[in-house]
Amino acid sequence: MNTAVLFIRLFACMAIGMPVAISLGLSSLLTIFLFSQDSLASMSIKLFETSEHYTLMAIPFFVLAGNLMSTGGVAKRMVRFAIAAVGHLRGGLAIASVLACMLFAAVSGSSPATVVAIGSIVITGMLKNGYTKEFAAGVICNAGTLGILIPPSIVMVVYAAVTEVSVGRMFMAGVVPGILLGLMLMAAVWWRAGKLQLTPPPKASMREVFTALVDSFWGLALLVIIMGGIYGGIFTPTEAAAVSAVYALFIAVFIYKDLTFKDLPKVFLESSKTTVMLMFIVANALLFAHVLTTERIPQAIAESIVQIGMEPWMFLLVVNVLLLIAGNFMEPTGIILILAPILFPIATELGIDPIHLGIIMVVNMEIGMVTPPVGLNLFVTSGVTGMNLMQVTRAALPWLSVLLVFLLLVTYIPEISLGLPNYVFGK
């Protein structure tokens, strides 16, 4: 009864247009007030504990680093390198766009930031070289989803905070899937470009490739600093986020000099707005998770599933369907915060690795970002290209099949996500 009332209140609040954070907090408050033996003081305590959550401290720093990279000329240099490296292939500019998205994802941790940073540069060039606006928009919209799969990823940090798994293992688990999805998108572009008979630009010389690589070196070095620092035991993922923000500030202002000190207040303000929005959702979601735990809702669901004899593959199928539906109506952070506390204990009971479950959830969130009506990448791509939302949706949907095939591979071949972290850290 308590479970039904909690979720009815939650979805009723969201259905009438209430923000996700307030919906989570209000439904939790009413459940505690009416049904729980917890005191209302536990709410304020839980909200205060959120501000002390060490893992969550990584979020504002990764947000700031991503914004500095977006506005500091790093994306522009990454695009030049990608075009020099693979631009001569069939569909080379589009393939270079995917590669640039992969590179920028490795320093930004955000899908919308990746779409804006790369899309605003490459789409104009693609149109000048004979690509249709629909083709360009579809590629960038889908390739931009790599921003939350290739580490560092803000969504992965949130999942790790909610489920208390290792952020380092989550980051490492995203490397191979991120590269695989990038290669699958490149292969799809190559095949489609053959149908359209697009003429690639001339092949760059090794000198041009090397020059572009050197020019983008300082931006690419951030990936080495973050991942090398974490796995070399130099600093924790949270400390790595702080280092990445300081490093991004340094190269944007003093190395590339694309930002001046006058530009910094605007960057800090935008980063603060994003951080406040995310942390307000996280705080209320952790309160929601607290109610779930005290009422033993996840444990009760897990026991029921085990009793009916549901196989792990069946559970993962149900999880994918549930997440794909949720992705149509909610943004990734909200979905992770609401569903991870419920799915995590069930997966553990069925013997499914929590890291594997985390990657499955992230891939589903990627798909949700390119599906209407609230797919965030659709809105961002619309703003970058000047196309209306329906046009962007039609342009993105053909490429969605690649993401769905990739989801099946990641779901039922766990070694794709678990192989590298198990090799590095041990099982």
Positions of predicted regions on the chain:
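Alpha-helical transmembrane segments of multi-pass membrane transport proteins
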Residues: 1-427
